[in-house]
């Protein structure tokens, strides 16, 4: 290698470092605005439950906004995957305000949706615009993944999980290491920025640890299978229902109005009869699971059902926080059957249902460590690995590719 090539390489790293720092600051700040907005909206909705009656009308507004302003941005996360696989060249900047506004609307009126997919889209959209100004190999994909990582990290403040999520999610079985350096820097900076600006991190340090015995290893493997099946059930149900409702109700206005009206009635009935509250992110279910060690036996399946129906209707938001809630509540239900500590099993479910539904491995393992501490890391590895072994084509991301063997 010549001194000139070494100098050029050094210049590239200096440039990547500076841009990753800026991307982390920018995306972290926007994630804070988005995340705090969701928290305020969630609190407001819980104090004004009749808002859920207007879920159908809110849906009509969402469809109108996307019809009027969306264009290619209407593809959402699918567009991010298309750019990552070079099927599309760019992501319209309008995606950022549009996805933030429509997700806030979905939450305000009681939709059962998440936030992670939105944050990833925000980060990817903003970061990818820098690629055209940098002359390095694979700049488009590198900056796309850098933004995806920053978006995830700014919202959840789990920079390691965010980094590896971005590197492994585009193509199952391949780790895009060329983006590791800028993605890690942007993730750390985005996480620090959103936290410094007031967005709190979800952290539940576990006091209990599982002992390393053959019996516990078998039990955790069985849990990995159960949680893996739950994640795949979510993914397959979402894919099937999206296609079915689009075929049965091809008009998006009629589709979201009819399904939204039905959802509002059922969600309100369940809430008012004290069966459970399934609107919003599902953080209420997560809080009860980890702070009280309790959940209803049906919480996980109802949260799964309402999230799948809400997203299939056309409401905006992510899937990951509902997946966390599904995993945690299913874990609370399964733990007594296996004689294992409730909070540990809930934590394993939190991580591995997410991993199964997204067909990722390293990200859910690291989520377990960053949210719950690393004392139980070997058991996160076992459960997430078992869940990852299930059919990889069953994913919430239709644009995801599976690497050829």
Give the residues covered by each predicted segment:
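Alpha-helical transmembrane segments and immediately membrane-proximal extracytoplasmic
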Residues: 1-405
């Amino acid at each position: 290698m010549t001194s000139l090539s070494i100098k050029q390489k050094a210049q590239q790293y200096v440039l990547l470092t500076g841009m990753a720092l800026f991307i982390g600051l920018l995306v972290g700040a926007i994630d804070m605005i988005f995340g705090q907005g969701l928290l305020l909206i969630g609190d407001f909705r819980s104090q004004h439950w009749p808002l859920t009656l207007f879920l159908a009308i809110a849906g009509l507004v969402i469809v109108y906004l996307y019809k009027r302003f969306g264009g290619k941005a209407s593809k959402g996360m699918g567009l991010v995957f298309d750019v990552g696989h070079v099927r599309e060249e760019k992501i319209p900047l309008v995606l950022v305000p549009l996805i933030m506004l429509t997700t806030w609307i979905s939450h305000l009126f009681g939709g059962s949706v998440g936030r992670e997919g939105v944050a990833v889209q925000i980060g990817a959209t903003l970061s990818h615009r820098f690629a055209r100004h940098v002359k390095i190999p694979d700049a488009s994909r590198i900056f796309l993944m850098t933004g995806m990582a920053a978006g995830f990290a700014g919202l959840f403040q789990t920079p390691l999980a965010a980094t590896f999520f971005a590197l492994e999610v585009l193509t199952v079985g391949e780790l895009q290491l060329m983006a590791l350096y800028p993605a890690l820097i942007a993730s750390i900076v985005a996480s620090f920025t959103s936290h410094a600006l007031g967005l709190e991190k979800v952290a539940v340090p576990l006091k209990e640890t599982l002992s390393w015995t053959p019996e516990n290893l078998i039990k955790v493997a069985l849990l990995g299978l159960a949680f893996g099946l739950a994640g795949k059930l979510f993914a397959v149900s979402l894919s099937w229902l999206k296609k079915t409702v689009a075929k049965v109700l091809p008009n998006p206005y009629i589709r979201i109005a009819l399904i939204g009206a039905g959802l509002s009635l059922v969600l309100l009935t369940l809430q008012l009869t004290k069966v459970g509250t399934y609107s919003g992110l599902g953080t209420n279910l997560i809080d009860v699971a980890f702070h009280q060690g309790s959940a209803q036996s049906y919480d996980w399946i109802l949260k799964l059902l309402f999230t799948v129906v809400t997203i299939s209707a056309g409401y905006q938001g992510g899937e990951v926080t509902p997946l966390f809630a599904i995993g945690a509540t299913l874990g609370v239900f399964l733990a007594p059957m296996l004689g294992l500590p409730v909070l540990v099993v809930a934590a394993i479910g939190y991580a591995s249902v997410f991993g199964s539904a997204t067909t990722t491995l390293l990200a859910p393992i690291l989520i377990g460590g960053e949210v719950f501490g690393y004392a139980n890391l070997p058991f996160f590895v076992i459960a997430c690995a078992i869940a990852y072994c299930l059919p990889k084509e069953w994913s919430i991301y239709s644009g995801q590719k599976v690497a050829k063997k």
